[in-house]
């Protein structure tokens, strides 16, 4: 009887550890293994828009969707994104879930600016989480070259295509957001065709 209880206890411990590991895989971004590539890359582009309060994630997701031909505003996307904190901030997992609901196999990754630029070759903008002053901020990265990244930033004046250019070094600094496990986070989404 004791051996059976010990055996059941071991199996429960194994199942608990597996559950924790699977949960961590859902919560934390995976390290991107793509090789960074030199060269100029631009993706499908759209019109940037000014955000409402805490709507940068919605604006970035809407930019990506508009670049792929969908008609949506940042406010509409923000309203649909799950996993909002009580203050209105969006978790990266919420944006990933929303893009999956829209038919995109979105993946949350951690990687360098070079790796992010390699992901742009898939054809759609990449949503990056960066430090903007004292707050965290989502932007759509729409292109890059050997020196700079081109952003569609909802805090900058609206424009066609991109409205902010940052050096690779500056972008790498902006990616250091101060949350262990979430440094250098971005969300990729290639259309599910």
Residue ranges, per PLM feature:
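N-terminal Sec-pathway targeting helices
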Residues: 1-17
């Amino acid at each position: 009887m004791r051996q059976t209880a010990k055996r059941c206890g071991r199996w429960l411990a194994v199942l608990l550890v597996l559950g924790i590991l699977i949960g961590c895989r859902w919560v934390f971004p995976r390290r991107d293994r793509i090789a960074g590539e030199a060269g100029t890359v631009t993706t499908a582009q759209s019109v940037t828009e000014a955000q409402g309060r805490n709507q940068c994630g919605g604006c970035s997701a809407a930019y990506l969707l508009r670049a792929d031909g969908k008609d949506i505003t940042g406010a509409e996307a923000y309203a649909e994104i799950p996993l909002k904190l009580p203050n209105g901030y969006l978790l990266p997992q919420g944006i990933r879930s929303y893009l999956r609901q829209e038919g995109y196999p979105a993946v949350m990754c951690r990687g360098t600016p070079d790796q992010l630029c390699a992901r742009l070759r898939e054809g759609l903008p990449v949503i990056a989480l960066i430090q903007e002053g004292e707050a965290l901020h989502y932007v759509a990265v729409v292109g890059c070259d050997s020196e700079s990244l081109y952003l569609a930033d909802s805090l900058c004046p609206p424009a066609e295509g991109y409205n902010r250019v940052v050096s690779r070094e500056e972008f790498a600094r902006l990616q250091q957001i101060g949350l262990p496990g979430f440094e250098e986070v971005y969300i990729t989404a290639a259309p599910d065709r």
